[in-house]
């Protein structure tokens, strides 16, 4: 899907700052430095719109990106970063929970997991939490270019087994920002959830 004019509209920390209107929203969640910003930039074909950082825990707000007045991408603060204080983690946690559990415009969540490693306890908690709230989930296994293509099936199997994957509510796609594979399939899922036309 071609996006011509993506814009960061607001970096929100509470419900009163969320954008008005009824555009569908797709949220991106995952551990710090799992590649959320790289995925967003790849999907919209804009380097640098979503800020990529070598410093984990950099995103500390809900960043709402308006894509041509068609939908919003919402970049959610990364979890699992030890150097963020406990108080900050609790603050982020309540902010994220408020958004993910109560936002009517939210049509699906893309949960990013590093393809090179087994899902962490934080990954499992996030998946179970999204399942509890009955949010449609797309698991994107990032950095798949670092995995031999012959091991893709094994990676998928490990992720599904570890998460106790529910195939009726969830989908799984392997993705590489470097080699650009998986982006078309991710867009197809987004368009289906947000009921978008080309």
From Swiss-Prot:
Per UniProt, GTP binds at 30-37, 57-61, 75-78, 142-145, 175-177
Molecular function via GO: GTP binding; metal ion binding
Q: Which family does it belong to?
A: Belongs to the TRAFAC class TrmE-Era-EngA-EngB-Septin-like GTPase superfamily. EngB GTPase family.
Kindly give the Gene3D superfamilies that the UniProt entry links to this protein: P-loop containing nucleotide triphosphate hydrolases
Ranges of residues in domain EngB-type G: 22-196
Q: Does the keyword Kinase apply?
A: no
Name of this chain's protein: Probable GTP-binding protein EngB
Q: What is the lineage of its organism?
A: Bacteria, Bacillati, Bacillota, Bacilli, Lactobacillales
What biological-process GO terms show up in the record?
division septum assembly
- Report one GO cellular component: cytosol
Q: Which superkingdom? A: Bacteria
Xref: NCBIfam families:
GTPase_YsxC (TIGR03598), small_GTP (TIGR00231)
Q: Which UniProt keywords apply?
A: Cell cycle, Cell division, GTP-binding, Magnesium, Metal-binding, Nucleotide-binding, Septation
